[in-house]
Design a protein with these regions (language model features):
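Cytoplasm-proximal transmembrane signaling helix
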Residues: 279, 284-304
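Short, glycine-anchored, charge-dense loop/turn motifs used at functional sites
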Residues: 86-94, 215-218
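Extracytoplasmic/periplasmic sensor domains and loops in membrane signaling proteins
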Residues: 64-70, 96-157, 193-205, 221-255
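Membrane-proximal N-terminal soluble sensing/regulatory segments of transmembrane proteins
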Residues: 58-61, 96-103, 174-186, 192, ...
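Short, hydrophobic beta-strand elements of compact beta-sandwich sensory domains
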Residues: 167, 181-190, 261-288
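Juxtamembrane extracytoplasmic/periplasmic/luminal helical "stalk" adjacent to the first N-terminal
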Residues: 1-64, 71-81, 88, 122-129, ...
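Sensor-regulatory modules in signal-transduction proteins
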Residues: 171-176, 253-260, 267-270
Length: 304
């Protein structure tokens, strides 16, 4: 009898773990689909902008017209945090903020140059230093900086890196053999942005999402009974345990005295380098409660 109970318990333990993994695998696909849909929307917006005949004419001598068009674009797509229009020499003609930077050698500028050189739309996820994007002490720079939690008393350490989706669309002169005469660059910064996390949790009950750079959470809606803000906290597990085959890691972690099962997946940039992590998790008791009822039901049948 004891052997049967133990074997049944072992079976249900394995079932729980398998269900957890399968659930999170499916959930991860919904997150990545949402992210890809956002990038595709940015791409389509860039293509419409670049294909506008008025924009085409304004590229030569009407910066005011470009600035007005860019402001309209921002109003329609208010999640865009960094937008520039550049000429064929990769010089700024209009930008979404007076505090926006576009220095030589920056990742964004290099990607824009490549897009114009090959005449192809570029879409990728990148991690870029905030000093390449905005002037220090600007609202944008401060808003996207992540204060690292649980430091020594008096310490004020920040993460000054941004995870963002970037789209570059070449602008062509329709009256001159379709030559590339510039580009529009659109970026959506994920730091301190709960759009994907909130959307995810609406679709997946009792489940949470977080993005992290260098092991620091930059956006998160993780909640426990005692804590509701985990932005700036460190991911407690070792990223070196990732499975290289599928570039992800499944495991359990103690989140503020609450055990969560989680699935982490690496995010790669245009150079196919791992730059960040997207992680999803759910309190283990949410799974355990469901399967525990099945376990009790089976034992009940045996003793009838």
């Amino acid at each position: 009898m004891l052997l049967l109970v133990l074997s049944t318990q072992h079976f249900f333990d394995r079932q729980i773990q398998e269900n957890e993994r399968n659930y999170l695998q499916v959930a991860m696909k919904t997150v990545r689909n949402d992210m890809e849909n956002r990038m595709d929307e940015m791409r389509k917006a860039g293509l419409l902008f670049a294909g506008d005949s008025d924009i085409n004419k304004a590229m030569y001598d009407d910066r005011n017209r470009l600035a007005m068009a860019l402001n309209n674009l921002k109003r329609n797509f208010n999640y865009l945090d960094y937008v520039v229009i550049v000429d064929r020499e990769n010089r700024i003609l209009a930008s979404s903020s007076p505090y926006l930077l576009y220095p030589d050698g920056s990742a964004v500028k290099i990607l824009a140059a490549s897009s114009m050189l090959f005449g192809k739309t570029h879409v990728s996820e990148e991690v870029v230093g905030l000093e390449e994007l905005f002037t220090k002490d600007s609202f944008e720079y401060d808003n996207f900086s992540i204060k690292i939690l649980n430091q020594f008393p008096g310490a004020q350490e920040y993460l000054h890196k941004a995870l963002m989706g970037i789209v570059v669309v070449p602008i062509r002169d329709k009256s001159a053999d379709n030559d590339v005469i510039g580009a529009i660059v659109l970026c959506d910064v994920l730091n301190n942005d709960n759009y994907f996390a909130e959307r995810y949790s609406r679709n997946m009950d009792n489940s949470f999402l977080a993005f992290s750079i260098d092991g620091i959470r930059i956006a998160s809606n993780i909640q426990t009974d005692t804590k509701s803000n985990f932005v700036g906290s460190r991911a407690p597990h070792e990223t070196g345990k990732y499975l290289e085959d599928d570039k992800q890691y499944f495991g359990k972690v103690d989140v503020d005295d609450e055990i969560h099962v989680f699935l982490d997946q690496k995010i790669f940039n245009s150079a196919d380098e791992p730059i960040a992590v997207v992680g999803i998790g759910i309190p283990e008791e949410k799974f355990s409660g469901i399967v525990s009822n099945n376990y009790k039901y089976v034992l009940g049948l045996f003793f009838l």
